[in-house]
Structure formats: C-alpha cells, structure tokens
Amino acid sequence: MQDSVFRIESEYVPRGDQPEAITQLSDNIRAGVAHQVLLGVTGSGKTFTMAHTIERCQRPALILAPNKTLAAQLYNEFRALFPHNAVEYFVSYYDYYQPEAYVPTSDTYIEKDSSINDNIDKLRHAATHALLTRRDVIIIASVSCIYGLGSPEYYAKMVIPVEAGQHMSMDSLIGRLVDVQYERNDYDFHRGTFRVRGDVLEVIPAYHHERALRLEFFGDEIDSIKEIDPLTGNVLGDVGKTVIYPASHYVSDRDNLNRAVSDIREELRLRLEEYRQGNRLVEAQRLEQRTMLDLEMIEEMGYCTGIENYSRHLDGRTAGEPPACLLDYFPDNFILFVDESHITVSQVGAMYKGDRSRKQTLVDFGFRLPSALDNRPLEFSEFEKRLNQVVYVSATPSRWELDRSEGIVVEQIIRPTGLLDPLTEVRPTKGQMEDLMTECRSRTARDERVLVTTLTKRMAEDLTEYLTSMGVSARYLHSDIDTMERMAIIQALRRKEFDVLVGINLLREGLDIPEVSLVAILDADKEGFLRSTGSLIQTFGRAARNVDGRVIMYADSVTRSMTAAMQETERRREKQRLYNEEHGIEPVSVRKSLETPFDTLYSDARSAAAKGRGKGRGRQAAPAQTAAEDTTAYGISAEELGGLIQRLEREMRESARDLEFEKAAELRDRIRMLRERLLQQD
C-alpha cells in the first residue's frame, strides 16, 4: 500500500474567506465532527477550499457530484491541483442505458440495451485500483457510487502478482488471466485483452489504455517484465514486479462460483415450486429457461450477460443485505464532500425506490429470480451507515443539510477575485426576444458569452433555432445529450466556437464558465422547482465569475422567490463591496485554462459538437439542422407527417442493416416523437 502525501501544486494561495473556511473545516474534521456545511457563494472557490482541507487533513476523499458534467469539471480541477496524487473519476459507464423491464398491461418485455463508454470503464477500474493500492486517493463520483459493484474482498483476492524470476508457466498465467475475465486476442489488442507470441505474453490491464505489460518467459519462469506502448511496442521501462487486477469488478474464484451456482439452483427450485403450485406455468417455464442458460454460461465461462443480477449469491450475502459499492472500497477514515448538496442528497435518496419498482415486476412475472432485487443501489439509511465524516457543499443548502449539521455552517461569501454577486434586474416579457437579441449582440461584440435558461427542452431547442436564424451563434444543452458531448459543448462555448448557450436546469449548479457575463432567465415568474429561490440564486451564480456579470429576468410580475433571491444577492453584494473597500481590492474576472486533463475523453464529442451532431441517442446537440427539421413537422399535414415517418423508418432499417446502430436508434426515437405528434393532430 503506497502512503504518499497529499500535496497541492498551485500558483494561487487561499484568499478572501477561504483561509478561515479551510481552518474551520479542518479543525472540525480533526475534532470528529460528523456533519458540517460549507455555505459558499458561486465563484468563491469552494473546490479550492475542499482541496486545501484534504491536504491539511491528509485523508482519502470522495467528492460526490450531482451529475456527470459537474463530476468531469471537478475531476479536471482536482487533477490540476493534485498532479502527484491519485485523482480518479467514477461515474456510470453507460453512454446509453435501457434497463430490462416488463410491462404487464401490454405483455411487453424490454430487453436490456446499453452502450458502454470504454474510457469511463477504464477510469472506474483505475479508481478501484487506486483505492486498493494507495492512500493518497481522491475519487470524483456521481450517484453511481451507491450502486452494486462487486465485493472488494473478492476483487482484491483475485489479483495476479507477477515478478521477474518468479516460477510460473505461461499456461498457468493464461489460465489465471482468463479466470479474472481477460480475453485472449492476438489481433485486436486493447484494454482487458492479452496476446501471446512465442515465449512472450503481453497484456493491457483493465485500468490502462496507453500502457501494456510484456512478460517474457524462459521455460516455466518469468524472465523479465517490461512496460510497453501497446501501439508501437516500444519499451517504456523495466518492471521488477507488479500486480494485474481483474478485468471486471464481478469476479470470483472457482470454489465460490460453484457455491454460488448451487445456491442459484436451490433458489430456482423453490421459485419454480411456488409458480407451479399457483398454476403459473408460463412464468415457471420462462424463469427456468433463462436461469439455466445463465448457469451454463457461469459454469463454462465464469460469467454471463447480466451476472450482476446474481451478485447476492456471488458475494455470499443474505436476502435483503445491501450490495458492496464504491464506498466499501474506501478506508474507514475517508471524508465525503457532497457537492451541490441541496440536489445531490435527494438524488441519493431517490435511487432505491425507482430501481425496486422496475425489478419487482421482472421478479413477479418470471423474468428474474427474487435475488435480483438485491442487485440494487443503497437505501439512504444504508448510505449513511457507510459514511465517516461529511461536508455538505452548496451555495443554497437545504433544510435537511442544515438540520443534519446541527448548525455547524462554515460561510464563504468573499471571493478571492474580489468579484461581487452579479447585478440583477427584471424586464417585461413584451418584446423580450428583441431585447435578448440586443443583449446577446452587445456581449458577443465584447468577446463575452451568454447563458439563457428556459423551462422545457422544446423551448430550449426552439429558441436556439430562432437565435441561429437571426445570425446569433447558439447551441442548446439538456439531458438528452450524452455526458461527453455536454462537456464538449461547454468547452466549445469557452473557446468561442459559439456565443450563446441555451439550457434548462443543466445551467444551474456548478458550471464554471468565466467568459459568461450575462444570464438571461425566461419565464422567471413561473413559480416552481426551476424558479424557486434556491434555483434562481444558483442560476444567478453562473454570471458571478465575470467582473461584468449581470442577470436579466424576463417576467410580468415579481414572485416571492424572485424577491427573496434578489434580496439575498444584494445582501451578499453589500458584504463583498465593503470587504473590497476595506482591503483595497479591485475585482477581476476569473481566469481558467481551456485545456484540461479530460480533453482526451471527449475529443470525439467535441468534433461532433462543432458539427452540431451528437454521438448519443435521441435529439442531440444538432440545434440548427435537427431542431429545424423536427420543428417543421408541427406545421405540416397529417398525410405529409405520415410520409416523413415512412421515410425515416426506411432509413432506420437501412442503418440497422449496415450495423449503424446508434444512427438507427436516433432515427427510432425521432419516429416515436413524430408518431406522438401525428396522434395529437388526429
């Protein structure tokens, strides 16, 4: 176990409220305080404060973010601050995920369909590898960290230590690699595979892309181990000894597999008896056929498709016992920082019930054994039991966090840059489009950027089309766009590939775009989740990293939420102004590098974003072409709409025949949407 020291490398030092906040947080952690709140305004450097707290306490940390976009941003920042420590990224590796489901009313079974991002899968393996091999670890994670992952005990038990001079035959090593789910591939050499050439075996570990291991044998002895470039074969260095970690988190030794198979067979026997006694013969046949096929695969290969549904048996857990997850890989003294806690905490609490409802139907109708219910995210109470010390980080903490921390709130109002909270004003909705166009052109003339928030995806897409048609370079951002492309779009905005970004709630929490000087909020007087006091304050904050930051709310009335948000913003502005006057500080805009360590992960997505086309499913960031094409469908007759659907269906079938499944899936989703419009017209 490597015991390195957390060490920040930065040209900046804590300023404003940061030094006091770092001291208070660190002292509370050392004193054993279990829960505390860091209430920091947008742009006050909460990430920098978290980093210095970690450095001062010298403990492993988990940073829990509300979505992949913010997790990626935090990953960039912590990697830059801790270049010599293990900063890793752990989010869902699905670019697209359609869970297995059954709809009893229509007798429709929906098979699991997914697309795994290989880069993110590698980063997940790198995260667990780091946790098991060193102590200077910071993991940036989404709510994916509470989902079942496979037992850390079995994962660590199945590692393969290798050393130059070790007595081990090549056949023995090949067998062990296959046991931990590496695949032999002598032609397509990639992560998680190995190849053999004479007395040389080369393997790319699951947590690497750019480096491979070359093991040279002399008889039944490992003669040498070298690190090589998998593409060129060039030797990068000699390795005296190393450890090869499994290619999957769901691994187990043969004895445990045999025990698990026996347990699964017994559960199947009992379940079949129950179905047959109730004369549910269809369910019995379905369950027996599916389960026996899975068991055959497990016995022959050591795994099967959907093996996670048998994780309770593989882990040796009892019914109802929670699964192992990323939290179980951490040492007991780790610190949890819940970023944007006002939304992240509720996310954690919501995961279990949604998952349970879907799987219960599968179990009831014979698609899965009851043990599949234990392949699940943690319940909130189980999540809390796994925590040691927690810091809730938010500009607008909810009542739950404030109560949980029992009044231990560390405030961070003064920004290191001297920036004040943005000026806010309310303008009438009459003529708002013309006014917005004028403001956008004014900002772009000064090489600044604009964020516009709407209430719905359709409004975001239509507004983007309108702005584009009027000569304003604009794109939209919402939840239909996959993770990597979201990051690419944000980077493209910063690089001035376009000037105006239109979105919904994705533009609220945490997005760090210092080039933005104007945030325009449409329908600001529509009370609700997206226009609550907390949401408005968060949205205001997107303009708080620029010295010329301003917020314009378009509304015909001023709601209580608007009033409260403006009053709180003015209170903070006054406190910040007085501090600047007292210390002779001149506000300056935040400066942030455009290049990030995460660039390699979304370079393809950036290319797609620049073209206005996405790699993911459904309607992506293709605002000018796709949105325009779909929008015109509203104005055509039912007959023409039917013709358009038929044309798209032909394209979908052709794409499927050509194995262009992503394109086929995108066309399928557009066809569904057009059919809904056709029904509305009827």
Curated annotation (Swiss-Prot):
PROSITE patterns: HELICASE_ATP_BIND_1, HELICASE_CTER, UVR. Residues 609-628 are annotated as: Disordered. Residues 27-414 form the Helicase ATP-binding domain. Residues 642-677 form the UVR domain. SUPFAM superfamilies: C-terminal UvrC-binding domain of UvrB (SSF46600), P-loop containing nucleoside triphosphate hydrolases (SSF52540). The keyword Repeat does not apply. It comes from the Bacteria. SMART domains: DEXDc (SM00487), HELICc (SM00490). Residues 432-594 form the Helicase C-terminal domain. The beta-hairpin motif is involved in DNA binding. Forms a heterotetramer with UvrA during the search for lesions. Interacts with UvrC in an incision complex. This is UvrABC system protein B. It comes from Oleidesulfovibrio alaskensis (strain ATCC BAA-1058 / DSM 17464 / G20). The gene is uvrB.
